[in-house]
């Protein structure tokens, strides 16, 4: 890297150790969120965050992440290398301090890093504590330094193992089987999505991810390289690739307001949904916060002022609301904050008050300039806002109908709902079943103490293509709202989902195991993602997995959920075995449906969660939206994985 910023010395004296490691192995979830799939991947993010911090300081422009054959991870950067000199206070190498003390690192020394990433901010020492083995290799001062640890403890002092003119840090770690008992298998897709996101958020950095467990047809290991020259502008194009823009190009700005670095990029499209993605120091703030509030304030006030002065609102008979300015808007807000304060349920809501005015001012200035210089686009945006206001007005009446019907007790429940007798929502589950015939079988097969059945007639409305009032007028969707007991509107937000009277804590989508069933599942999931995302985020949405085959021979029978499983059973049963392919739930009798799909002791339910909101938004838009080419490309790319009924 270049010599710029070298005046800020990064040495052993920059390292501050805040506390010991005692708690990490005993209470890992306090440090990395959980010890399941998310926590496992979070280890990688913590190590990569160190490299990103170097990049933010201008010291690093290449980061490489490798999933090794044994599911260990190697990360490498071309930064300055972690200091290796003796730490004054601790009396050991600064590298050992960084690797073995929680919170130790240059990110707590304001001269070394102005801002720093990492949601939990626990750093690489936490990764070390939760790894059965970790080796840190540092390229610095013309030498190669190395130290190996087991479960957070150094096996020997830092030693030199060679000479090199390179600079940087290389870390290889293997998660500890004693901690990660659920899985230690890394998902290439999950890591790849995060690396792509980081490349967009930090333009000019080359990030490579390689999977040494899998080879391409060329014989090379599976690998991708991400480099974004335009940052958020390219990120918007990526997120909106399957939507049709209504303005000529992305509106973007980058600068500093009141000491807060702010980056914003936005575009309007023909969709009816609002897609705002906010980041603080590269962390995706799902719950929003002061930066998002500042964006909304700046957007609404500037567009309202322009719309009023343009005369285009003169014939409108009702007030424009803030939501109207955000329909069909895709925007990314990224801020860098020296000492972020996180709040909210998952600590992903920014609380720093000074950020609101900084973002609001930045957005106002950006939009004022853009609207002045692009009058045609300005007019298009205002017309879109007017249409949104008219649709909102119509949707309000439809929403009130849903509200009234839902609030009614007893008699307000849909006629088709076969309810359960249990009153405690935490113990209750409802199955959303496709079609009346399958619904009938499910009603006979269920345990009516705690299992309710709501049959859905055919394919529900594709909400991705529908205006809001059409969604609330749709009978099947109204039945879902009413059956679940979910209402719209809280004290804080008239449009927010109110889960206070949710009647079931397991909402199970149960569709046929064929192409039509998958389509219906996707339609229902699209509805939940766009209109009831809180249910997904709270862990209430599940997908049932009915078997694909019944394999029989004489009195012996067993079920198969995949072709491989079917083949194994046929081999096990020997010649004379027969196979029945279940194309629909209705082909099973009530006892079979209970045994395979509904019995809590035997069934497999897949919980629906959102790892990456931006990617989920992009995929729903691509699969269910208007644009055909991206969908065709996706299907061609993934056809190999599909189980298609002909």
Question: In which residue ranges do the predicted regions lie?
Answer:
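GHKL-family ATPase ATP-binding module
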Residues: 1-14, 21, 43-45, 53-55, ...
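Conserved short strand/loop->alpha-helix "switch" segment adjacent to the catalytic nucleotide/phosphoryl-transfer site
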Residues: 26-45
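Residues immediately C-terminal
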Residues: 53-54, 81-82, 515-516
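Short conserved segment of the HATPase_c
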Residues: 82-104
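Conserved, non-catalytic sequence blocks in retroelement Pol enzymes and Pol-derived host proteins
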Residues: 85-90, 291, 322, 469
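C-terminal interaction appendages of subunits in large macromolecular complexes
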Residues: 390-409, 424-429, 440, 444-446, ...
